[in-house]
Design a protein with these regions (language model features):
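Substrate-gating cap/lid alpha-helix
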Residues: 87-139, 166, 170-179
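A short helix->loop->beta-strand "cap" motif at the edges of active sites that frequently abuts
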Residues: 71-78
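Histidine-centered active-site loop/cap adjacent to the catalytic His
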Residues: 152-216
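Acidic carboxylate-rich catalytic motifs and surrounding loops in phosphoryl-/glycosyl-chemistry enzymes
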Residues: 80-83, 128-152, 164, 170, ...
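Conserved SGNH/GDSL esterase-like catalytic core that processes O-acyl groups on lipids
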Residues: 1-64
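Short, flexible, mixed-charge acidic loops at enzyme active sites
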Residues: 91-98, 148-160
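Short catalytic/ligand-binding loop motif for oxyanion handling, primarily in non-cytosolic enzymes
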Residues: 35-39, 85-91, 141-145
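Structural beta-sheet core signal
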Residues: 29, 78-81
Length: 216
């Protein structure tokens, strides 16, 4: 759902899932950085900004939404890590020599830091509920958090970038990364559905019965 925030996607999921039988759904939710950023006409008609004054509220809203989804749908909903494909135009260009506007480097650093933090919470929640982590963001960043921190200490230059081979025009995904993400999501959903709805084998049932009798 391009251009939709996590809150909007969560609302759609909540409205859609209950209309299906409780025993036959598995939902994978994925949202990008539009959950955090705002669209602005300053500098470029389609540029995005990450106002530092709203930073704490934005992150709190995201974490609240994620927690509510997990509490409501438990292991039947899998939340993908946020893939910030759009550190779009205004944040990341294909040419690292292009200087950032004044103050924007702080926004960029804050956005990346918060994305890493939110993704760590998503991974922990998925792990707590037995869901596999679909790490789409790892396929887009060219540096790890540790490398980013080290690079910043060595230099004040902008060091964050996306893997250019995955971006057609510096903004949009290539067909290659779309295919990878689609296969990853559908394969995970199929495997999880099989796991959720495969009845236990007779051997497992016998073992459980035997254990319960021993307890008595």
């Amino acid at each position: 759902m391009p251009g939709r925030s996590l809150q909007q996607i969560a609302r759609i999921a909540a409205e859609t899932l209950p209309s299906y039988s409780y025993d036959n759904y598995y939902c994978i939710v994925h949202a990008g950085i539009c959950s955090l950023t705002i669209r602005t006409a300053v500098g470029h008609p389609t540029s995005l900004r990450y106002p530092l004054i709203e930073r704490e509220n934005k992150v709190r809203e995201i974490l609240q939404t994620i927690n509510e989804l997990k509490i409501t749908f438990r292991n039947r909903i899998n939340i993908c890590t946020i893939a910030p494909a759009s550190l779009i135009k205004f944040f990341v260009t294909r040419h690292p020599t292009v200087p950032l506007p004044r103050g924007l480097d702080k926004e960029q650093d804050a956005l990346i830091e918060d994305i890493f933090f939110i993704n760590s919470i998503i991974k922990q929640l998925n792990s707590d509920w037995g869901n596999p982590n679909i790490n789409l963001s790892g396929r887009l960043f060219s540096h790890s958090k540790k490398k980013l921190r080290k690079s910043r200490k060595r230099s004040h230059k902008r060091v964050t970038k996306l893997k250019e081979c995955h971006l057609v025009d510096g903004i949009h995904f290539s067909d290659e990364i779309r295919d990878i993400c689609f296969r990853l999501i559908t394969n995970t959903a199929a495997a999880e559905l099989i796991k959720l709805y495969t009845p236990p084998s007779p051997l497992t049932q016998e073992s459980t019965t035997s254990d319960s009798q021993d307890d008595l």
